[in-house]
Design a protein with these regions (language model features):
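Basic/polar phosphate-binding segments, predominantly the helix-turn-helix DNA-binding elements
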Residues: 162-169, 179-207
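Short hydrophobic/aromatic patch on the recognition helix
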Residues: 57, 207-208
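Non-catalytic, well-ordered alpha-helical scaffold segments
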Residues: 125, 137-145
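Basic, amphipathic alpha-helical hairpins
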Residues: 130-138, 152-155, 172, 179-193
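Short, structured helix-loop boundary elements
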Residues: 100, 121, 140, 170, ...
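Linker/hinge segments immediately adjacent to helix-turn-helix/homeobox DNA-binding domains
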Residues: 144-170
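Generic protein-terminus/edge-of-domain signal
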Residues: 1-59, 65-66
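A hydrophobic/aromatic-rich effector-binding and dimerization subdomain
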Residues: 1-10, 64-130, 147, 152-157
Length: 208
C-alpha cells in the first residue's frame, strides 16, 4: 500500500524515532528516500522481491516507490530510527559537482534497495542516533555526513534485476481502484463520503 509520509515541502529531511516499535506496518511504498536503522530485535526484512532475515541490527536504504517492510519480534528495548527525504534531492544541482558524485550514485543505487556490512552498521548506528538528538542547522551537516559515509561504504543491492517497481505500483493502484469500485457498487443507494472511500485505500482526502 502507498504511505503518505509526514515530510513537507519545507523539510530537507525528517527523522522518525521509534523506541519499542510495534512492527505492525504492512509492506508499503512512498515517494521518498528512506534510511532505516533497526536495533535490538530480529525478524524478516522485505524490500521489493528481496526477503532476508536480520538479527539484532539492520541498516537499509530504499529509494522512491520501492515496497518495503520489517517484520520484527517485539523485543523489549527494540529501537527503530527512520530518516526520510524527498526524491527531489536527486535533482539538486549540487549533486552534479564532483565531490557529491558518490552521494548521487548512492541515491541511484537505493532505488534497488541497499543493505550494508556489519562494520558499516555499527559505525553508522552512533551517527544516526546522534542525529536524533540534534537540532537546527547542525542536523543538515550531520545528515550530509551520513549520506557521504554510506556512499563510500561497501553495500549490497537487494532487489533482483528482474524486479519492476513501476509494475508493482501499477498493480497496487489497480487493486485500490477495484476496491473503491466495489465499495461504490455495494453502497450506491446510500450517501457516500469522500473520507470513507479514502480511508478504504489508506489515503487522505486531499491525496485521494
Amino acid at each position: 500500500q502507498k504511505e503518505i509520509t509526514p515530510i513537507s515541502s519545507d523539510d530537507l529531511f525528517i527523522v522518525l524515532n521509534h523506541p519499542n516499535a510495534k512492527f505492525d506496518y504492512p509492506v508499503h511504498y512512498h515517494s521518498d528516500y528512506e534510511i532505516n536503522l533497526v536495533m535490538n530485535t530480529y525478524g524478516e526484512r522485505i524490500v521489493g522481491d528481496s526477503v532476508e532475515k536480520f538479527d539484532n541490527l539492520d541498516l537499509v536504504m530504499t529509494g522512491p516507490n520501492l515496497p518495503h517492510a520489517w517484520k520484527g519480534e517485539i523485543v523489549e528495548g527494540n529501537h527503530v530510527v527512520t530518516i526520510q527525504f524527498s526524491d527531489k534531492l536527486l535533482n539538486f544541482p549540487i549533486l552534479e559537482k564532483r565531490l557529491f558524485s558518490p552521494i548521487k550514485q548512492l541515491l541511484l543505487d537505493s532505488q534497488k534497495g541497499i543493505s550494508f556490512s556489519e562494520n558499516t552498521m555499527l559505525a553508522m548506528k552512533e551517527k544516526i542516533l546522534q542525529l536524533t538528538r540534534m537540532q537546527g542547522f547542525h542536523t543538515v551537516l550531520e545528515f550530509l555526513s551520513i549520506l557521504y559515509d554510506l556512499s563510500t561504504a561497501d553495500r549490497h543491492i537487494l532487489v533482483s534485476n528482474l524486479y519492476d517497481t513501476k509494475d508493482t505500483i501499477r498493480t497496487s493502484k489497480s487493486r485500490r481502484i477495484a476496491k473503491v469500485c466495489d465499495y461504490i457498487e455495494k453502497n450506491f443507494e446510500e450517501p457516500i463520503k469522500l473520507g470513507d472511500v479514502a480511508a478504504l485505500v489508506n489515503m487522505s482526502e486531499s491525496a485521494f
